[in-house]
Amino acid sequence: MRIWTLGAKVPDLDREIAFVQALGGELVLDDLIPFEGEDFRVPLLRLGDKYLHIAERMVYEERLRRPLDFGLCHVVFEIDDLTAAREAALAAGASEIAPVTRVSAGFGTRDVAFLRSPGGILFELVRILENAVPALP
């Protein structure tokens, strides 16, 4: 398991992209991600050796008790065995936000699960089936 990216909710995607680029970051993908019948614009930015996904509304946000505040909102873990990682997280006290879903977009194809830790950390487990994102340095 490793951290693949962080997710952040922002009020203005284009303004945030320009800000990150002004800091030396790079727009890797400006992607539309289909999830539960809706398309979400979720640009992927690279800053040094890390990725950052940004969105004006997170794909799982409708399933939460209240809307997310702006700022960092979840961490994405890349894993090899999604079933085992999800079961381990649930057994350790995590709650499921959205069931395992297959998502295909500009980044490739992934199986994803959205969960919340007992302490409230929102996280995503991702099994990459096809990767179309450039490797980090």
Tell me the role of every PLM-derived stretch.
Residues E61-E62:
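A cross-kingdom feature marking solvent-exposed beta-strand/loop segments within repeated
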Residues M1-I17, L72-F77, V126-P137:
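N-terminal beta-strand motif that seeds the catalytic metal site of vicinal oxygen chelate
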Residues R15-I17, L82-E87:
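Short, conserved charged micro-motifs
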Residues A8-Y51:
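Core segments of cupin and vicinal oxygen chelate
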Residues R2, R41, G48-K50, G71-C73, ...:
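Residues that flank catalytic or metal-binding motifs in active/ligand-binding sites
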Residues F19-L23, A88-G93:
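Short amphipathic alpha-helices in soluble, non-transmembrane regions
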Residues D30-I33, R41-L45, L90-P137:
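Vicinal oxygen chelate
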